[in-house]
């Protein structure tokens, strides 16, 4: 074989060698393939050449296919020098500790498979492998690549195992070194372990914590008890006193509804708590009153600076923060004003301070402003609502108040103020003109007993209503719950005996918005103008009520359950006196009359006897159209809200329906009595005004009263005070509008319930007996009074 023509093929980068490579012989087939430039060997010139190096400038880089490399693996042996260099590279890259578990060298693995070992490679080669030329292997060196791969896999596995052993040895060494020092020292515990709830509170912190708890529980009901605990909480130093006053002040300003209670507390504490010497030599002693007034003054004077700081928050990301701070400042300002007013009532604040505050809020003086700030306007309204009556009681203060209200009247027409504030100022001006009597009751904290007393006055509730009987009638029947309480129909409210909402009990009132029941026991929605009660009531048929022969006299439908009311009312309205097709056992047990136990009662005549007065009222009234009724209710609601007589007169004249004036009178009485006793006076003034203006005739007033009396038996179930209030209205109309006293007898005849009759008659006699003109009327109508007394028996 001719060596001059053998191509040199190398696996090193660049694809070339430095000349002929002895010992690198190929098989004839592979040599033939390497001699040409066919598909198996494609030359790429220029990409791998290095300028200046003759070995890389003219040589070709040869690429092999996968099949050729597989053939090379079978015939090529890796030289020992390459294996040695590979080991040195691993040492430099990974360190000796990563490969210390390997065999001495991969050369040993190689030499174990060779027939003639080379001892000169057993030593570590420290020469520079980059500068030396690779020595060609011996001709007889043959090694399979599979053996090399298996050897490398075994080497990696042994390296991982040795690494784990090495890590375990290091841990053992650490524990052994610690064991030589001695036993582990015991855990050192702190003398006072930290705890979120444990700690040694100082005397001041303990007192403040106690005071906070007392203030959180303070109510008008427990006022005296908790006030004593507060006095005994341990307020023994001036610092504790100041902090306690700060706590009370903060609670008061953020709870304005309870300001009267906190003002009373401050007054009592000012009398009971001791004073303390001043911290500064020659200073005034520290008292509860002085510290409290200083807090009020600082809060009042510091509000302006707080608003200035809030005004600086103009960034878009500060909008929420600005609103929150404005709300807090407003609450503190109004609460502070309310507290100062309540302290004035307790004689803890002199009037000169109050006048100074009013002048500051209104902007009086040399620097008088054309329009005060909105916060100041709201504060001054709050101030006069609280203490206006007290200031007017003093003649000197009243003259000063006159100047204040002149300026406030100017604010009612100042367009620079928001409409809400203008109306607020106007309400205060009207309040003073009305002798400081508010249109609606002020919301204030009440005790449980006060709430019960108010319920008795407003709803007519009486103690022990469940155990009492009225006019010899039994307690209401009906199904009982497992606890023994009456079962309720939907919308009847509570279920406890004697409470509002229990069927048939005094003060029984439906829940707002709940449906009513018609005479067939069907639930129907209630409208605002619908008469109150458990069933639908049509005005026409109800006015033509049959006489007592159609209805057993011993039964009071008000005391029957809701389901049984229809059994009686249905036959009465239809004009048939016979019992229903399925007699109720409940009705039989309540009546005990032979008329219901008889198998075939006699039918009543087609023309039952009717009270003549009721016929007269029915003949003179007509059913009001729905549109007119809606307008009537609307204008009456508006009048009871603003109470302007001329405007109400104009609205009634615009209806142009004189034939329905009696219905309007009835609606006015119904609406006023439904609202409560405070609306009796506006109702009477309205009817007197319309009668004086010749809009309502005396006959309209009489018919309207009779129409309402026909509904009173059902209305009285929901409004126990309705009979007494209605009697007062009738008496006042008799005194002022010329309503004849005989109408009282007619009204009593229209009401079948003796209890309601008595309520009406007693109210009439009481109202007219307290007036000289009324006494004259009573003396001239002794016959009518006797007839009324007979109706009460």
From Swiss-Prot:
Keywords: Initiation factor, Protein biosynthesis, Translation regulation. Residues 1-23, 105-129, 462-606 are annotated as: Disordered. Residues 208-435 form the MIF4G domain. Disruption phenotype: Displays resistance to rice yellow mottle virus (RYMV) infection. Residues 544-557 have a biased composition (Low complexity). Residues 627-749 form the MI domain. It comes from the Eukaryota. GO terms for biological process: regulation of translation; translational initiation. Residues 107-117, 587-597 have a biased composition (Polar residues). Residues 120-129 have a biased composition (Basic and acidic residues). InterPro entries: ARM-type_fold, Initiation_fac_eIF4g_MI, MIF4G-like_typ-3. One of its GO terms (molecular function) is mRNA binding. One of its GO terms (cellular component) is eukaryotic translation initiation factor 4F complex. The keyword Kinase does not apply. Plays a role in the accumulation of a sobemovirus (RYMV) during viral infection. PANTHER family: EUKARYOTIC TRANSLATION INITIATION FACTOR 4 GAMMA, EUKARYOTIC TRANSLATION INITIATION FACTOR ISOFORM 4G-1. Belongs to the eukaryotic initiation factor 4G family. EIF4F is a multi-subunit complex, the composition of which varies with external and internal environmental conditions. It is composed of at least EIF4A, EIF4E and EIF4G. In higher plants two isoforms of EIF4F have been identified, named isoform EIF4F and isoform EIF(iso)4F. Isoform EIF4F has subunits p220 and p26, whereas isoform EIF(iso)4F has subunits p82 and p28. This is Eukaryotic translation initiation factor isoform 4G-1.
